Regions:
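Extended, charge-enriched "interface" segments that sit outside catalytic cores
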Residues: 1-76, 80
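Glycine-rich flavin
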Residues: 69-178
Length: 178
């Protein structure tokens, strides 16, 4: 009976189902994880470029940033911080090198963001949005070649900086009331 009343799975839903496995999470939720399975997997490492970025520009930007000054006095980051973020490619961590990005692995991006967050929530948001909620990922998957060639280099360099807009109490989903 239930099969006759359930809606058919859409192509998008089927792709999501087929996209991968639960990997280690399945072991945890089994109630009796086989720790040897986890230990057999190689520990993820950074590329030389990623490690150099963490040791160099990430440390430098953390030293340059004063969260108290930015959030309570200036209500913005100093222009030298903005310029440094653009010059060192912080906005292009997920963008492929062929478009001017850094093409970092997710582990490197997460580590960069964790380190920056330890110093400044504002700076973390400014760098994090373009590398997560920004349009680069959408352009890479769904953009035309012309859109990618035009927009991705501008996003990677910081010439164009995307934003994330959340709706308010009188429009859209009213996120604060959820």
């Amino acid at each position: 009976f239930y099969k006759s009343v359930l809606p058919k799975i859409s192509q998008t839903e089927q792709e999501a189902i087929d996209a991968g496995s639960v990997w280690w999470d399945g072991e945890i939720f089994s109630g009796n994880p086989d720790w040897d399975i986890l230990r057999k997997n190689p520990k993820p490492t950074f590329s030389k470029e990623e490690q150099a970025f963490l040791d160099g520009p990430v440390n430098e930007i953390c030293e340059m940033t004063n969260e108290w000054q930015a959030s309570h006095i200036d209500h913005d980051l100093p222009q030298e911080v903005w310029d440094f973020v653009k010059a060192k490619g912080f906005f292009g961590m997920i963008i492929p090198k062929k478009y001017g990005g850094l093409e970092f692995a997710p582990l490197a991006v997460a580590t960069v963001m964790s380190k920056i967050m330890s110093r400044s929530g504002h700076l973390n948001s400014i760098i994090g949005v373009p590398n997560s909620l920004g349009p680069a990922e959408l352009l890479l998957h769904y953009g035309t070649p012309e859109q990618r060639n035009d927009l991705l280099p501008k996003l990677a360099s910081g010439e164009e900086i995307p934003c994330f807009a959340l709706t308010g109490p009188h429009a859209g989903s009213d996120a604060a009331a959820m």
